[in-house]
Structures are given as structure tokens and as C-alpha cells.
A protein has these predicted regions:
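Compact, glycine-rich, soluble single-domain proteins
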Residues: 1-130
Length: 130
């Protein structure tokens, strides 16, 4: 699975990958883990000492609600991205041990610090099968 950003959102037709598309496609991460169980969602990136550059941890939810991200026991800075209906709502750099942020989302993505620098609110961010 990979995480892909489309710089020109088109909510009616979804992401377009053909050569005629006006949307610019950017692969953000090629190594994506899904946090599907309660245990994996609770643990998140806690206790990890490093993250590969092409890595993302994605949390998918059935409905868009306010979701928290804490950095307790997270030893590396990360970029967090909150997404509703494939549209980026917010991107934040979070510091180890100190940060706590919340935002409404149905997809939450945690990336290595700097990996979210080109992701902007309003762009589309989708999980695609490899």
C-alpha cells in the first residue's frame, strides 16, 4: 500500500492518474502500515527510535470525528496529517514527548518529520494498493 497526494482536489471524480489529468500526483510513502486493531491504534509510533523515509502509519475510521495525537513515549518528531473524505484538513509537525494535537478526521496519517512538508490542506491524500 502507498500514500499518494493529489495537488488539485477533485471531489467529484476522485484521483486521476491518466496523462490528461490536471492533478499533480506525488507518492508520499510506499511503506504504509495500517493501525487496524485497538492495540496498534493505541501504540501508534510509541517506543520507535527511528522511521524509514518512505514510511507512514495510517489510522482509518468509519466516521469523521475529532481524533487526538499525543507524543508520549514517541522518541522522534513526526508530521501528522488529518484527512476527511480524502481531503487534507491539517498538517502539523509534532515534537517528541511534548506535543498533543487534535482535529476532525476519518483518516489520520503519521509520517517521519519532514515527509509532510509538501502536503497542504485542501489537497487530496489517498491510500492506494501497490
Amino acid at each position: 500500500m502507498r500514500l499518494v497526494q493529489y495537488s488539485t482536489p477533485d471531489s467529484e471524480t476522485g484521483p486521476q492518474t491518466d496523462g490528461d489529468s490536471a492533478a499533480q500526483r506525488d507518492v508520499v510513502a510506499t511503506n504504509v502500515d495500517l493501525a487496524e486493531s485497538i492495540l496498534s491504534q493505541t501504540r501508534g509510533l510509541m517506543f520507535r527510535r527511528s522511521l524509514p523515509d518512505d514510511y507512514a502509519l495510517a489510522f482509518r475510521f468509519d466516521t469523521a470525528k475529532t481524533r487526538d495525537v499525543h507524543m508520549l513515549f514517541v522518541f522522534v518528531p513526526i508530521d501528522a496529517v488529518w484527512v476527511v473524505d480524502d481531503v487534507v484538513q491539517r498538517v502539523e509537525r509534532l515534537r517528541p514527548w511534548r506535543s498533543f494535537e487534535r482535529e476532525r478526521c476519518d483518516l489520520l496519517v503519521e509520517l517521519p518529520a519532514g515527509a509532510g512538508a509538501a502536503i497542504e490542506p485542501g489537497n487530496r491524500l489517498v491510500l492506494e494498493s501497490s
